[in-house]
């Protein structure tokens, strides 16, 4: 087998973040992965981050839309709140469909179909923690879940681990 590279490699090639003010203000996005273990329970995530918004770590923007002076970040969420209509104009043309954070959560937890669907929905919280704005009209943000079904586990604990893994995978995708 080969080694896994995070950042602008593989499915992360060509990914950018912070496109909300236009592609000229964007930075490189990428692909990231993270896994957690609690006893025999394992929960991991792999995420390709091609977000319209900014990526945050511990509440601080680490990648996203550059400001006009190229000295820092413009804060995409604040910009959207102040300029929502203009944002729609930017994405009315060729950039529609070019924004998504998409990932997969993989676990060995024994979950049924309904619990696995809920796991995917709860894992989506990791996107909301790490990307702002997230799940906007021009995003295709989504998380899927796969469960091996070998370790009995509390579905809520698995969901919390999954959201953390998605959040950290997004952070790693831009570092």
Predicted regions and their residues:
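A structural signal for small-residue-enriched, beta-sheet-centric alpha/beta enzyme cores
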Residues: 1-175
């Amino acid at each position: 087998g080969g080694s896994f590279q995070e950042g602008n490699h593989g499915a992360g090639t060509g990914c950018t973040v912070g496109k909300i003010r236009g592609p000229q203000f964007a930075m490189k996005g990428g692909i990231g992965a993270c896994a957690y273990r609690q006893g025999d329970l394992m929960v991991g995530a792999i995420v390709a981050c091609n977000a319209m918004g900014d990526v945050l770590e511990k509440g601080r923007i680490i990648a996203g839309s550059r400001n006009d002076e190229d000295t820092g970040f413009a804060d995409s969420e604040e910009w959207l709140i102040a300029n929502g209509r203009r944002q729609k104009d930017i994405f009315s043309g060729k950039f529609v469909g070019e924004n998504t954070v998409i990932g997969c959560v993989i676990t060995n937890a024994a979950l049924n179909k309904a619990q696995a669907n809920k796991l995917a929905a709860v894992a989506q919280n990791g996107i909301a923690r790490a990307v702002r704005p997230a799940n906007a009209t021009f995003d295709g943000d989504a998380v899927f879940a796969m469960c091996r079904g070998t370790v009995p586990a509390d579905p809520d604990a698995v969901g919390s681990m999954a959201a953390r893994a998605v959040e950290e995978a997004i952070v790693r995708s831009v570092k």
